[in-house]
Regions:
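Short, hinge-like loop/turn segments at secondary-structure boundaries
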Residues: 8-13, 91-93, 112
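Short acidic, glycine/proline-enriched helix-loop-strand junctions
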Residues: 82-105
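Cysteine-dependent PTP/DSP-like catalytic domain, specifically the C-terminal lobe
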Residues: 106-111
Length: 112
């Protein structure tokens, strides 16, 4: 994943994205291919396409979020690798994983 081996799948993704109506984001969404916030639908489509085979710039993304004043990063989905990486990137940041009902309650308490 996130390698040139994904290029064929990325081309299929590009076709699907071209047929998808995207609304302007209501909140800033940072993409990991450019470490940038995109507002334009075509720029968002292009970033999503390139993210499929481009390198993940996780450290830079975390630093960019921190520069925007973000102190808590919540990883949603199976696993907790990214939450652990957040803490290793900067111990002042809080990283948490949300992947089941128990961790949902933990995240609610963390953000309360």
């Amino acid at each position: 994943f996130h390698s040139s081996l994904m290029k064929p799948a990325a081309e299929k993704l590009r076709v699907a994205l071209a047929a998808t109506v995207l609304a302007a984001p209501q909140i800033p969404v940072l993409n990991n291919v450019d470490v940038a916030v995109q507002q334009d639908a075509d720029a968002i489509r292009d970033a999503l396409y390139r993210q499929a085979f481009g390198p993940v710039r996780w450290v830079e993304c975390v630093q960019a979020l921190q520069a925007r004043g973000i102190t808590h990063l919540i990883e949603c989905g199976p696993g907790k690798v990214l939450a652990g990486l957040v803490r290793r990137i900067d111990a002042e940041l809080t990283g948490a994983a949300l992947y089941d009902p128990a961790t949902l309650n933990e995240v609610k308490e963390l953000l309360a």
